[in-house]
Amino acid sequence: MRDYTKQYINGEWVESNSNETIEVINPATEEVIGKVAKGNKADVDKAVEAADNAYLEFRHTSVKERQALLDKIVKEYENRKDDIVQAITDELGAPLSLSERVHYQMGLNHFVAARDALDNYEFEERRGDDLVVKEAIGVSGLITPWNFPTNQTSLKLAAAFATGSPVVLKPSEETPFAAVILAEIFDKVGVPKGVFNLVNGDGAGVGNPLSEHPKVRMMSFTGSGPTGSKIMEKAAKDFKKVSLELGGKSPYIVLDDVDIKEAAKATTGKVVNNTGQVCTAGTRVLVPNKIKDAFLAELKEQFSQVRVGNPREDGTQVGPMISKKQFDQVQNYINKGIEEGAELFYGGPGKPEGLEKGYFARPTIFINVDNQMTIAQEEIFGPVMSVITYNDLDEAIQIANDTKYGLAGYVIGKDKETLHKVARSIEAGTVEINEAGRKPDLPFGGYKQSGLGREWGDYGIEEFLEVKSIAGYFK
């Protein structure tokens, strides 16, 4: 059992002002594996005060000092690799291989990217006799999701530390263990007191007072659209800066000159990875009518090879949904797809055979999907693919952009000119050509209802800065 009932505030592990705790469930076993403090407004107030006091000195640290701090974090993060991997598999249900290859590694990559971005980042610019200065924004509230416990947390922390902005972090109460390990890392390497504060709890007890606190100058949130909207409302009371990374319903356009096996394998991965609990999942697969039959045959073959099961067993590729609530949501969407007339091609409602314990869902494919159906318009956040056919490229692009979201898009094929045309036409913050992957120094964020602002690398650093003009500085 992992019992983390203390908060990390002002460089110390302290008792929570609340006597309540939150149980953490292993989604693969449905068993309680630990608990964390259920913080409240008093905890938030104490943490914000510590961060505000730390800001007075941390904002004036040099770039080299902040780089040195990030470098220490990188090295200690690497030392804690096994602890991080084990924690994520326990709390998220991610297969061990995925926890190591993706979750652990992505967290590390963001600290490295922020450290390296500072090599060439210009915080000052001379314009004649005047000076433009970029300064740390100040106390920043970070609220992170359960689906990527290290990635989403590390990218925000790394950017804030790179600028000299102290933070108060509220991780998801469903996957809080990785954040506790990060706190232990920061404590060991000597992150200055008050620069990092961890307050565990739920949205009502911690998220709301953090978003409303008058000394918090910036809120960075990753999660659902409705919650992001509420954070904006609360932040608007004192005009806080807000950075939001929200949902998606990303299109994956398959071109007619594609290698069919390669395309089927790629689109399968984009749907089942992390059990489909990915905001950038390419769940709307757009296929030319002329290759539909061949593509579907290969797609079924690829899905049949996906192994769902115990995340601690070798060979497991897909673990459980994070919770019963999430499992039920996925089941509701699958049933909705059937009700609205989509054809169930693979998978369907219920659990995979032999997996009655745990929140396991069946990887599912719908075909003959109309883009106006619920399963094509709403974020399911599970391993459910909607295959939509198109007749020509203009129609494919129109379907791809017919969504309220714009977080990511994908295209796969051979003709470079066509690939470039599609990539430039998709209305999304990130587009991948032929499974190129996203490097941590590239900006990440969404169009439309997928968010505000950008994260990752130097663009992520920009979010934690204010710009000051000093006229006559060089006179």
Curated annotation (Swiss-Prot):
One of its GO terms (biological process) is aldehyde metabolic process. It holds the Pfam family Aldedh. PROSITE patterns: ALDEHYDE_DEHYDR_CYS, ALDEHYDE_DEHYDR_GLU. GO terms for molecular function: aldehyde dehydrogenase (NAD+) activity. Keywords: NAD, Oxidoreductase. It comes from the Bacteria. Its EC number is 1.2.1.3. Belongs to the aldehyde dehydrogenase family. This is Putative aldehyde dehydrogenase. It comes from Staphylococcus aureus (strain bovine RF122 / ET3-1). The lineage of its organism: Bacteria, Bacillati, Bacillota, Bacilli, Bacillales.
